[in-house]
């Protein structure tokens, strides 16, 4: 079992973990080459392991990496471990990966921001390599699902695709979470857009994931005008009584509001306290 926690640019590896109990989650990310590799474990259970590279198409053309992954930001504090990586792609595009493992809140947030030089049709496939001892159990009517034991008797995590509508009937055909050859795929697309944001909220609190969950995309405003999705996105997540807020600026920065919360930052992950106020877990300016 790996006991180290931290980030080494020289080794191209980061290990994120919320604590040191044997049952705590542990995420390893190897980013020193052109393809990401990952491993997520909880105690003795290995939930996923292998290639973590997204697949992207721009106007039908498959994009190829033109650089290794670069460490853009690493923060480890009392609230979370946070890793941000960036890779350049053919066609002048870039993909930025956010990875946040919250300590007290016990969730993993993984998201890709795809940034293009011109408006284009973007097709995205984010792939998570599940191990043989883990299956994805999709909900019947909504886009959520659970990582479970092979027989489905034990749940390891709740998975919510934040950029997609909660109900399948409200989303575009072909988009959502699906398993292909043992890999959990998140499929999304955007039409005539300069950016796409694809995020997963993965709840690792075993007692909490049995409770009802809901999420929705929020309206981002600037100067009393709605900000389009290629410039900024925001999401609200609720599992049981706990609620969180996520925000990412995708274009030029500005003074914006989200559920009445004012911000000028690039990235925000926050919780709502009992009084309904926003408490930042991680804020990147």
Question: Model-found features: residue ranges?
Answer:
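Non-catalytic terminal regions with compositionally biased, polar/charged low complexity
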Residues: 205-285
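Tryptophan-centered motif/residue detector
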Residues: 66-71, 108, 183, 210-218
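Short glycine-aromatic motifs
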Residues: 132-137, 166, 212-215
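Beta-strand/loop-rich accessory regions of lumenal/periplasmic or secreted enzymes
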Residues: 113, 125-127, 137-194
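Short Pro-Gly-centered flexible turn/kink motifs
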Residues: 190-204
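Short, surface-exposed beta-strand/loop "edge" segments at domain boundaries and coil↔beta transitions
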Residues: 21-26, 44-49, 90-96, 120-122, ...
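Catalytic and substrate-binding regions of extracellular carbohydrate-active enzymes
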Residues: 1-153, 227, 268-284
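Polar low-complexity intrinsically disordered regions enriched in Ser/Thr and small residues
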Residues: 53, 63, 73-74, 129-131, ...
């Amino acid at each position: 079992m790996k006991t180290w926690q931290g980030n080494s640019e020289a080794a191209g590896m980061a290990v994120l973990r919320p604590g040191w109990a044997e049952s705590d989650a542990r995420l390893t990310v190897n980013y020193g080459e052109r393809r990401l590799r990952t491993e997520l474990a909880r105690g003795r259970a290995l939930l996923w392991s292998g290639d973590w590279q997204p697949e992207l198409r721009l106007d039908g053309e498959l994009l190829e990496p033109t650089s290794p992954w670069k460490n853009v930001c690493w923060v480890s504090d009392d609230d979370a471990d946070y890793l941000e990586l960036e890779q350049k792609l053919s066609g002048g595009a870039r993909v930025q990966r956010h990875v946040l493992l919250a300590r007290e809140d016990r969730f993993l947030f993984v998201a890709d921001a795809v940034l293009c030089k011109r408006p284009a049709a973007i097709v995205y496939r984010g792939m998570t390599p599940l191990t043989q001892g883990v299956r994805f159990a999709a909900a019947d009517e909504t886009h959520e699902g659970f990582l479970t034991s092979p027989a489905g008797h034990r749940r390891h995590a709740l998975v919510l695709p934040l950029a997609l509508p909660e109900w399948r009937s409200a989303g575009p055909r072909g988009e959502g979470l699906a398993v292909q050859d043992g890999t959990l795929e998140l499929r999304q697309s955007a039409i005539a857009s300069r950016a796409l944001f694809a995020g997963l909220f993965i709840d690792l609190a075993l007692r909490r994931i049995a409770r009802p969950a809901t999420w929705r995309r929020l309206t981002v405003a600037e100067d009393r005008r709605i900000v389009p999705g290629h410039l900024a996105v925001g999401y609200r997540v609720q599992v049981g009584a706990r609620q969180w807020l996520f925000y990412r600026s995708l274009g030029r920065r500005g003074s914006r509001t989200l559920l009445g919360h004012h911000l000028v930052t690039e990235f925000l992950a926050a919780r709502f306290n009992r009084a309904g106020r926003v408490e930042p877990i991680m804020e990147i300016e």
